[in-house]
From Swiss-Prot:
PROSITE patterns: RIBOSOMAL_L36
GO CC list: cytoplasm; ribonucleoprotein complex; ribosome
Lineage: Bacteria, Bacillati, Actinomycetota, Actinomycetes, Mycobacteriales
Protein's name in the database: Large ribosomal subunit protein bL36
Keyword Ribonucleoprotein (UniProt): yes
Organism for this UniProt entry: Rhodococcus erythropolis (strain PR4 / NBRC 100887)
Gene: rpmJ
Transmembrane spans: none
InterPro entries referenced in this protein's UniProt entry, alphabetically: Ribosomal_bL36, Ribosomal_bL36_sp
Domain of life: Bacteria
PANTHER family xrefs: 50S RIBOSOMAL PROTEIN L36, CHLOROPLASTIC, LARGE RIBOSOMAL SUBUNIT PROTEIN BL36C
GO molecular function per UniProt: structural constituent of ribosome
Length: 37
């Protein structure tokens, strides 16, 4: 899980979602998991 000031899709399988008011990226590739914070 990377915590970054701005999250971006890295590949076409990445999805940007909002969870508990946080913007997150989830993906099949676990290296692409990101959270904004």
């Amino acid at each position: 899980m990377k915590v970054q000031p701005s999250v971006k899709k890295i590949c076409e399988k990445c999805k940007v979602i909002r969870r508990n008011g946080r913007v997150m990226v989830i993906c099949e590739n676990l290296r692409h998991k990101q959270r904004q914070g």
